[in-house]
Regions:
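N-terminal export/assembly segments and adjacent metallocofactor-ligating motifs
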Residues: 1-223, 250-251, 343, 429-431, ...
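Active-site phosphate/pyrophosphate-binding segments
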Residues: 217, 228-328, 469
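Glycine/threonine-rich phosphate-binding loop and adjacent beta-strand/alpha-helix elements that clamp
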Residues: 151, 392-415, 426, 430
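Long, contiguous, secondary-structure-rich segments that constitute the structural scaffold
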Residues: 416-466, 517-525, 530-612
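Phosphate/diphosphate-binding loops
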Residues: 5, 11-15, 357, 363-367, ...
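Flexible glycine/proline-enriched surface loops and loop-helix/loop-strand junctions
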Residues: 198-199, 238-241, 270-275, 406-414
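Extended redox/cofactor-interaction regions of prokaryotic respiratory oxidoreductases
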Residues: 109-179, 183-186, 195, 211-215, ...
Length: 612
């Protein structure tokens, strides 16, 4: 028996008991206060993926057109990569190389150690703006921090609001915390998700109208002594009736929501990431936090967590030019980038405006190195593919951006063939580059010991239980509403006549793009019956969905849980398996806050495919 830790991009960061005596099997660690002995629905695919015959076992070298390969040895593949790195550095400098990485593997060594190598050669740096950064930046401007409350304190709340998050699918342990408390549960979400069905009250604003919803709540609260003086008289015009016309939420429900926020204190708000991927998404998060401040609930939000981990030690200090993640295609078009080194990410699946991204990589003949477990869409575009290790095949630590526990991940089996962990790959690359600095060759155990010592974690206890509690580092909340009024006044709802708003949330089966090749994803277009009737469409019709970014064909699913005026296509499906995914349609426009993603501000036309 050993302890594993889920390194996927998920709030829960579960502690796992793993056995490999009679075949690989996993179960939730019953001692862990959050995991509490059970794992999410997606966890069963971890074993299937690790043992899959589809896994890459030998490095691949491109031959001719992209997608054509021959197998080579790891030694040869790394020689090709190092030769290309040296050629580019000599020709135009390290900044012509861009590591493209994100949260496909969040384990601390796997995530940060490769940065030591890239910082050593002075590459460009990818700005992580795809997920939650807009909301995080907005919270920092208003409160001085994006670090919220300990989720275990949800048990102390009289009311819990899940705003723009579907924890029944994406934070199952947090959902159970809420459901086993005595709190009244509100869900704010345009879609009637499984979370909304399980809540006491579901508020369903049109996408992108969270700001007028909050302003109308403040309008109601102004009658009960809650003074929003920092934003002037804006709230006066946002009566529930006025806001109802914008949001689609009945005025009476807005009033009830406002009074519950007033009377059911203490309350907590779990601020989700999906709804802030709108053009004004960061401002929406900031407006919610402002409302909470006025009600004396400043710190009672869940958004992010920090624990004093020395990230500079883990990854070094980046000094290269910043390249935005969301509109990578346009960044590649205007910057001299000659190599993309991809790990912990599948950008030719997960980034918006896929048609342009693929076109520019092809047109500029950008050299691509991809380190992954499978021959996914990004790997199919690569010049060199290096097989990666699963998290059962290396030692690491996993922290959480939700709770206050760090977990050990112990190696339980060897990688297949020449598959290699992130740590070991970059040690070999450093050696082949001729580097001598100790930090480039530091071992996994040495790094683990240093991190644990810094956190005052007893190593023996960690290895005995699989996890340890660590201190949340939050700092003092410093309220600063400067400029908020002007920001709110700049808001106007987005509409496009004749178009539906496209939402691309996470589905029940996947984490990002992981698992579509193992289980298969939902690739239907989900539409409200009313919109289908207006467009003369029926369930099961083959439809064309199009906008200025692309055109795709799929089948329609009539779904009353979808908000009128919107269409849902779940993200993460593999274009190499289905011929397309939702990011062939999504906008790569960015927000004001941290150039954050705005994919949920995409609009599309939907038409029935006509028989020829």
């Amino acid at each position: 028996m050993a302890f594993s830790a889920c390194p996927k991009d998920c709030f829960d960061s579960c502690s796992i008991i793993t056995e490999n005596d009679k075949g690989l099997s996993i179960r939730g660690n019953p001692m862990h206060p959050i995991t509490s002995g059970f794992l999410c629905y997606k966890a069963k695919f971890f074993v299937d993926a690790a043992l899959s015959e589809k896994r890459l076992k030998k490095p691949l070298l491109r031959e001719g057109k992209r997608g054509n390969f021959r197998e080579v040895t790891l030694e040869y593949a790394l020689d090709v990569v190092v030769e290309k790195i040296k050629e580019i550095i000599n020709d135009c400098g390290g900044e012509c190389i861009l590591p493209v990485e994100y949260a496909g593997n969040r384990a601390l060594i796997s995530y940060y150690f490769p940065r030591r190598f890239f910082n050593r050669i002075g590459t460009s740096v990818l700005q992580h703006s795809l997920c939650d950064e807009a909301g995080s930046a907005a919270l920092r401007t208003l409160l001085g921090t994006s670090v919220g409350m300990d989720p275990e304190d949800l048990r102390k709340m009289r009311m819990i609001v899940f705003w723009g998050i579907n924890p029944a699918w994406t934070n199952v342990h947090g959902w159970r915390l809420a459901k086993t408390s005595n709190a009244k549960i509100y869900v704010v979400d345009p879609t009637r998700t499984d979370t909304a069905r399980g809540a006491d009250v579901h508020i369903d604003p049109r996408p992108g109208t969270d700001i007028p919803l909050v302003l109308s709540i403040l309008n109601v609260l102004s009658n009960y002594g809650i003074d929003s003086k920092e934003i002037g008289d804006i709230v006066l015009r946002y009566t529930p009736e006025y806001a109802s016309r914008i949001t689609g939420v009945d005025a009476s429900r807005i009033r009830d929501f406002a009074l519950d926020l007033l009377n059911e204190r203490p309350f907590a708000v779990h601020i989700g990431y999906g709804f802030q991927r709108n053009i004004k998404g960061g401002l929406a998060v900031k407006t919610i936090a402002y409302m909470m401040h006025l009600l004396g609930m400043d710190g009672n939000f869940i958004y992010d967590a920090k624990h004093g981990i020395d990230y500079v030690y883990l990854g070094g200090t980046a000094r290269g030019r910043i390249i935005n993640q969301v509109n990578l295609a346009r960044e590649l078009e205007r910057n001299d980038i000659r190599m993309l080194f991809v790990y912990n990410m599948n950008p030719l699946n997960s980034l918006p405006n896929q048609n342009l991204l693929r076109e520019i990589i092809e047109r500029k003949n950008i050299f691509m190195v991809v380190h992954d477990l499978f021959l996914n869409d990004t790997a199919l575009f690569a010049d060199v593919v290096i097989p990666a290790a699963s998290f059962f095949e290396f030692n690491d630590l996993v922290d959480s951006y939700y709770h206050d526990y760090i977990a050990i991940n112990q190696k339980v089996m060897d990688p297949p063939g020449e598959a290699i962990s992130n740590h070991d790959l970059f040690v070999l690359l450093s050696r082949k580059m001729g580097f001598r600095e100790h930090y480039l060759f530091e071992g996994e155990d040495e790094i683990i010991d240093k991190v644990l010592n810094d956190l005052n974690v007893n190593r023996d206890e960690l290895y005995r239980k699989g996890f340890a509690r660590i201190r949340r580092v939050r700092g003092e909340l410093i309220f600063n509403p400067e400029g908020l009024r002007e920001e709110i006044e700049s808001y106007s709802p987005m509409e496009r006549e004749g178009y539906l708003r496209l939402l691309s949330p996470t589905g029940i089966h996947g984490v990002g793009s992981q698992h579509d090749n193992i289980h298969g994803f939902d690739i239907f277009a989900h539409m409200n019956p009313s919109d289908a009737l207006n467009l003369n469409l029926n369930d099961g019709d083959r439809v064309v969905i199009k906008n200025e970014y692309g055109t795709v064909e799929t089948f329609l699913k009539i779904d009353p849980s979808v908000k009128i005026g919107t269409i849902i296509i779940y993200r993460g499906s593999w274009p190499s398996l289905h011929g397309w995914n939702v990011n062939y349609l999504t906008t790569d426009d960015v927000q004001e806050y941290s150039m954050g993603a705005a994919m949920n501000s995409t609009f599309v036309k939907v038409e029935k495919v006509r028989d020829v």
